Structure formats: C-alpha cells, structure tokens
C-alpha cells in the first residue's frame, strides 16, 4: 500500500547517524520520517559504551555546536568523564565519557519523540523507490510505500551483515538483530560501487564475577568534572563510576595463538577489512608479536546492570577460546561471560561516489551517512548524519548544499577524506588527520560553527542566546586585556616576580603578560589586588565563565600561531574552492596523463581542492587543469549557501 502521507525526507536507520540526520532535517522544517526496524533500539550503542576520545570528541563538540543531540545525551547519561591529553596543548585535548547505555538511548529517544516535524515508524526497509535518476521513497518489508523527495540511508553494519564466532557464522545486522539483505541487493542493482568491511566486539562480562581487588582503578576527572555539550552542566550527570584495568599476559597470548586455526580472520572465512586502529585481540597478538602484554579496560555498561565491556579484546575466536583467554587475565579468573564476542562483515559503498553533501552522484536525493560510507565509530556516524540530514532538508527546499571546509571543522576533514580518497579500511578520526588542528580545537567548536548553524536553521534560540553571550564576552575581555597596561611604577616588583619570575622593566599590556609561558588568565587578573580583573563580572553563570576564560587565554597565548595558520589557509584557499564543471571531459585537458584523466573522469571531483587530493593527481596536473579552466572560462569560485557560507562554509551544487 501507499502510505497516505507524503514526506520531505525519509531517514532509514535509527543509529547514531540516523538519529542525528532525522533531527537535523526536522529542525530545518522538513517533514521527516525516521524508519527503523525496531523503535526500542533507537540510539543503541552497539559496541563500546563510550563517546569521544582523540579526534572523536572534536566531532561530538562540532555536532553539538550545530545543534545536534550526541553531546547533550552524553551529559545526561555519562557515568565517567575524562579529558584526554590534558597535559598537552589545547589542539589535542579531547573529552571522553563512559555512558550508561539505557540512559543514553532514553535521552536520544526523548529528543526524537519531542522534535517537531519528525515522525517515527517501525518497519525494516527492503527497497528504494527510484524514478529515472532520482529517489522518490522507500518500501518496507511488508510492502508499505512511503514517498519523499529525499532519502538518507544510515544502515550501519546491517547491509548483508554476517556475524562470525569462530568458524560458525549467520546473517545479522548485529547480535540479536536481522540483517538488511534485501536492501543490500537493491543497492547493488543501482550499480553503486561497493565493498565489504569488518568490525568486531568483545565478550561482555558479569561484574559480579570480577575480582576488583586484583585490578587497578581508573576514576574519572573530578576537579572539575568535564561536560560534553556547550550547554551542559555537571549537575546533569548521573552517578559517576570508575573503570578498571587489567592486562593480557604470555599465557593469554599462547591461548590466542592456539586458536588461530579456528579464527575466521586467519582461515580466510572473513574477507572484509577490519579497522586498523581498533584491531581484534588476535590481530594485536599477530601484529605486535614482541609485546608481552596489552592493557585491557573494564568499562561499566551502566548503573542498573552488572555488565562490563572489556575494551581491548574484540575477538571472533571460538567461544571456548574466548572463555579461556578471559580467564587467563588477572581479576577475571572466574569471570562469567554474558555475551560472546563476534566479528561482523557488512557492505559499504565507495564514498568517492558521493558529493561533499553526502548525496550520491548517481541518484539525486539519495544521501548516505555512517558506516555505509566506510567509517567506524559513533562520533563519525553522528557527524555525517547531521550533515546528510541538513543537506537532505536543503535539497527539498531547493537550496544549495553546505559542507564545512577542511580548515573549518573536523567534519570537513572527514567528508573531504571520504569523497576524495575513499577508504581501504574502516575510517576513524584522529587529530593528526587535520592540517589546521590548532584552529580546530574542541574548545572553540561553537565559535567556529554555531553562527553558521544558526544561519542554516539548525541552532535554536536557547543555544543562540548562550553562544551570543559567550562570543561577546570573549571579544570584550580580549580587547580589555590588550588595552589595559601596567608599568614598573604601577605593578609592584614583588607581584611581578611572583607571577613572572622577575620584575617588569617597561610598560606591558595584560595580554602581553598573559602570553608568557606559565602565566594564566586568573594570575593576570589577580595582579594589583585584583584591580587588573574586569570591572564587572563577565557572567553570573560559572560554567559559561570558565568557557569564556578558556577562550580568552587560548586566543591570546596562541595568537601568533593562529594568525600564521590563517595566512596559510588564505594562501591555499586561492584555488581550493574553484569549481569544476559538471560535464568536463578530462581527456580533453591538454597535457594530462592518461592515468590522471582516467581518475578524474572516474571520481568526478567537484572542486580543484578535491582533485588535488586524489591519489596520483600531481601538482603539475592541477596546474594544467587550472590553465584549461582559464582558457575555456570554465572555473568559478564556490557560491554561498545563504549567509551561512559567507561565514566560511563551502557549498555544493544541488541538482533539482
């Protein structure tokens, strides 16, 4: 049957990508339907019970700055919070939280059920409705046809998923859920380039059978307790719990080696490539054969369960081997396994077949987000979901798509890497992937993106008001520090020596003093009995006050580095956003090698910047391409997506 209501956007899948996509589309005013095979698993944390980490936390902050749900849901469900790399520079500091799975799902579902313009429906999707070169809807497993002008696919590991435990395997999207076999077959009929990837998860352990007296305790940060959302408060956090640490040993490694003859990875049963930066324990033992021990973190799954997640022993070994290797570790000698670990193989589609908007190049109105694009991780999925949902909404509103640049957001780095370089293994985000990471910090994600999000229709009034107060206070206080001066006469020598190590010998602005190593904002403001502080409180909100002080201090201390990076960005931007015509035949570009013209014709980059990052496309080839465009009068700079792009975002043409 044809469902009587027609929608603007349909989102298929209710994981981290799908929920952010649906919320973003609905926030923009698009009439949105979220189709999921099971409403009870909306926002499910399928693998580890944690959010954030190096690079990943940056993405979560960016999703939050654009009005997304992941950070706020983590603040409401997080049972341990830590700042990683806290002793290092601000560019690589990252927030990580352990989450209560049940509370996290509840927080996400609450937002979905209370979001205007968003409808939920429980049915697996088996088919897409395609007319000519555009998608027009989706068909469920019982034949209900839903019509829409755009569809966002966020199928996770469900596309033709196959679960492996030892040499036993069966179809499934994850343990306990069916695979999307029919939908996978339909996508293959559309001739979209695809491949197989693999990921895995460890066995879960009953905490009542763990001997914690033998383990090392790892508490969260308590002074101060971190928050994830820019609007978050520590008071929102539920009860906090520690994690625990144990280690593998030589006996563990011998047990694993003895089971490799029954490992689906090492017997050729699994063909998909696994994640390099989250390897299985059997892969670790093989790749790092000289290492005598590996650290294993025992992470609580929640406040109302005894289940623990042993982070570091993802495995697809036979269950008897899993049982033996778990029992070989200190503190786990009598541990009871609640769920076996397993590997899962699934289909993904080559992201080079996508525009930077995450719309497929072959089928108008069809967007992909999450693991279907070859990424791994909740955070990478959520960021893509928000972008795909935003652009699906803009597509039906006949507006140009938007995507941040590499110098503007980790989301921009993620998407650019995917659509220009593709993936040979599951892609995860690291700070090392960003050329401009000094400017792309967790702490300034809102300063980089919230104004753009407001223009795009993603940011509500409450977030905008809080951001505006913060932005204005940072600007005022920075200018005050730059324009307030102290001299040897006005600053007592003993105060100067206590703060700076010696008395000053000429006039300095407070900003110049703050720029010195080891000098803090509070230290500068405390000079002259506090007279160097602001005349009026910056804010009466203690959390916002800390954010303002952090922004002011980092902005002043790193001003020179940030300005140099901005100059580099400006130089590189000269050709980065020069658009390439849709119909250009690269075989006609004089001087291009056959290999280069073939790659450019295959991947159809949208800009000179994207073309330059395709493997094998040399700087000389880019120069030839620029000459060709100039001669033909074809090249043009990107336009803008409303006023949002004028704030710095790149745009992608949307075909209607």
Swiss-Prot record:
Chain segments carrying region Disordered: 637-656
SMART domains referenced in this protein's UniProt entry, alphabetically: GIDA_assoc_3
Residues reported in the UniProt entry to bind NAD(+): 274-288
Cross-referenced Pfam families: GIDA, GIDA_C_1st, SAM_GIDA_C
GO molecular function: flavin adenine dinucleotide binding
CC cofactor: FAD
GO cellular component: cytosol
SUPFAM superfamilies (alphabetical): FAD/NAD(P)-binding domain
Compositional bias ranges of the Gly residues kind: 647-656
HAMAP family: MnmG_GidA (MF_00129)
This protein's name: tRNA uridine 5-carboxymethylaminomethyl modification enzyme MnmG
